[in-house]
Amino acid sequence: MPLDARIRARPALSHRAEENRNMHHEADVVVVGAGIFGCAVAWALGNQGRSVILLEKSLKEPDRIVGELLQPGGVTALEKLGLRECLDDIDAIKVYGYDVIYYGEEVRIPYPENATDTVQEINEKQSHSDEYRGTKRKRPEGRSFHHGRFIQRLRQKAMSNPNVTTIEATATELVRCGFTGHVLGVEATRNGEQESYFGNVTIIADGYASKFRKESRTDTPVVKSKFWGLELIDADLPMPNHGHVLLGEGSPVLLYQIGTHETRALVDIPENTPTASVKAGGVKGHLKNVVLPSLPKQVQPSFQAAIDRDRLRSMPNSWLPPTTNKTPGLILLGDAMNMRHPLTGGGMTVAFNDAVLLSELLSPEIVPDLDDTKLVLQQMRKFHWRRKGLTSVINILAQALYSLFAADDYQLKALQLGCFRYFKLGGNCIDGPVGLLAGIIRQPFVLFYHFFSVALYAIWIYITSASLFGMPIRAITSIGVFWKACVVIFPYIFSELQS
């Protein structure tokens, strides 16, 4: 049965199940973290008749500078979950695509048309070559908003589910079977008291700074830069209802409206950036002396006002490849399990699609009893590989684009220019890449095709832009440009395959 049909026919559990959650702290599923993924998966499993305990250390509205742009692929997943209304009444802004500005030169990149068609419908309408390139026809929309407002709407929706009990408590450690190591639930602190919560499955979704990640994997997130955020008031954006990516000397700057009067500015600052050192005036000095002059003239007044008014806040830009959940009784998901650079705004799209897929694979029709650990682990292996059609694309694209957009050598600069000129070609040269970024096109080969199309186009520009006498030298050094392209993308491809 389709997920949305199961939502309409949601079975309510007995009063006894609710009593078990409230009095005995026992449920089919314990979810740790009422964030993007935690709320979505609690809602989805509750709609299937599962008894769910949702734990969150603080139910106050969060105040973060990321998680504010939902791509069209995420909006579609939200609709499948029956959570589309969470985008209402939060002053969310429609997003139609991107505006990329390269040293003052501008190109509009709208979301691709016909994004809601199925693969079968696309095959019927397109040639085989067009399908490989990812060409589509009917333009969808994303949404941008204040993160905290959206989270509170998700939490309200989860709390309204009769099969979900939401408790404000801080999970402190896993509860394991002393003989098998099977995870039985979590210990948590609530109102200063230690309590235990038990479930056949414990889902950990406690975010990028997860305290439980080490329970199922030994590697840690790789952080090479931070996003520093400002909130601009009544900013005059070059292209309203679009995300703006500003490229120039140094790392990229993002601008996107999150409310009627508010615009988020995110400035990427790599570690050990000299212009952001204490001697150079710190981060505020970098923003004033390096970033501000590079912005479009119309944005500069609101950016300057935000620097003078706001406290500076940052978030680490992390890379953490996915892993298969192999611990009996434990499922690690959300940012706790997989992260990519937030440049492409793909995190929430991944989370909502993971919630859809997980609820399908663990549905009562397939897994009648979540206490069947062997079957649950079998389904989690399927989950790991089935999610890659979308998540591997978003993961690899985010890391590869950041490498190009934060170019710091001549090879990457050549690829960066090639990427921008490729977008300027229009047509499929923008529909394919932005379809991948939007979570609409779920074909890794399309990513591979466009990335190396960019690389070859960049090499052609690199060679032909030289003088007649310089072309032979450029032809030789272009080998380094192609090699750099391989160095950029293949490590992330291998990490997806190995994981």
Name what the model sees in each region.
Residues M1-V29, A44-Q48:
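Extreme N-terminal leader/targeting segments of oxidoreductases
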Residues R6-P11, T275-H384:
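FAD/FMN-dependent oxidoreductases across multiple families
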Residues R6-R8, E360-S499:
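C-terminal helical "tail/cap" subdomain of flavin- and related membrane-associated enzymes
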Residues H24-E26, T76, L87, I93-E215, ...:
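Conserved N-terminal helical subregion
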Residues V32, G46-V66:
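Glycine-rich FAD pyrophosphate-binding loop
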Residues G38-C39:
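N-terminal Rossmann-fold NAD(P) dinucleotide-binding loop
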Residues L54-L55, I204, L333:
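Generic enzyme active-site microenvironment
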Residues E173, G181, E187-K326:
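Conserved FAD-binding catalytic core of PHBH/FMO-like flavoproteins
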